[in-house]
């Protein structure tokens, strides 16, 4: 249950960062994963993605986004079979990168790399 998913996830992640630093982890060994799909509704996931650039601006750590083949993509597209969500997964990866994600976890590496190369070459982002 979230009343403000973005704020609550950011606060949770900051708590985890603080705990890691107190436990002696080097800051350069940390990255953040907002946990798309884990205990969140479709709207929560959409809000997190739409707010990604905003909340990342307040973080000193790289962000990993893993939405490949997720249920949220099936809910948006109406495609029930995860393996058939490649196009949606590539689109979500591009949206994540466009919003500043440092790392994207994907199943369809070749297809995602092709899409990223096209976006880079066409100047969608540098």
Regions inferred by a protein language model and the residue ranges of each:
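Acidic/histidine-rich catalytic cores of soluble enzymes
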Residues: 36
